[in-house]
């Protein structure tokens, strides 16, 4: 199994998917590769590569070459990795308007994706070195979480997810102690 080093999102994703299926990291032979290199090794049919952990846009390359391998599961099946932005407590205390601006900008970007998808895909594609068309194709496998979805998540799902994630990270040795769950998120900026 090819994956990124311990503590990274691909490592966590692999550990999460394995745990949800009664397995652990100890049940697979692992090789540390970046998500892009892992996808490339899978596509190339590299000897000894039976599985790889990767993400978009590299997952799209695997999807485009089904003879090289089958996508078993994604974060659409196991929603445990999300793009977030975070600020230190000191920054939030000193700059609440800036933090609110970050949150508002995210939701404005979602509005732009709906109102001007082509322009949005061009901007986002340029950031990850993809054409607008390629980004549009790969973003179909993402979930854009609007304000209501964020509010729902932080109203209850976040606490349960954080507990499960902490238990898993403890079990695989990434963390030595569970964090104070009450200090993991400050959802006031999404209200």
Regions found by a protein language model. Name each.
Residues 37-127:
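Pocket-lining segment of extracytoplasmic ligand-binding domains
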Residues 93-174:
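Secondary-structure end/capping motifs
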Residues 28, 135, 179-180:
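Residue-level detector of family-conserved "landmark" positions at structurally sensitive sites
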Residues 163-191:
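Conserved C-terminal helix/tail region of periplasmic/extracytoplasmic solute-binding proteins
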Residues 19, 24-26, 129-131, 175-176:
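Short coil/loop linkers at secondary-structure junctions
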Residues 88, 146, 186, 190:
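Residue-level signal for threonine
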Residues 1-63, 118, 159-160:
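Bilobed "Venus flytrap"/periplasmic-binding protein-like clamshell domains
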């Amino acid at each position: 199994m090819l994956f990124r080093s311990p503590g990274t999102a691909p490592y966590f994703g692999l550990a999460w998917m394995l745990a949800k299926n009664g397995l652990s990291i100890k049940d697979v032979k692992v090789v540390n590769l970046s998500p892009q290199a892992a996808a490339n090794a899978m596509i190339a049919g590299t000897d000894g590569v039976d599985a790889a952990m990767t993400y978009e846009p590299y997952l799209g390359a695997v999807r485009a070459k089904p003879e090289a391998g089958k996508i078993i599961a994604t974060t659409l099946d196991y929603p445990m990795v999300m793009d977030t932005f975070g600020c230190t407590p000191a920054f939030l205390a000193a700059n609440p308007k800036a933090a609110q601006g970050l949150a508002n900008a995210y939701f404005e970007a979602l509005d732009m994706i709906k109102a001007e998808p082509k322009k949005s895909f061009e901007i986002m594609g340029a950031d990850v070195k993809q054409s607008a068309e390629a980004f549009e194709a790969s973003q179909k496998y993402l979930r854009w979480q609007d304000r209501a979805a964020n509010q729902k998540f932080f109203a209850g799902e976040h606490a349960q997810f954080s507990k499960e994630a902490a238990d898993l990270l403890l079990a695989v040795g990434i963390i030595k102690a569970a964090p104070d769950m009450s200090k993991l998120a400050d959802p006031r900026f999404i209200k």
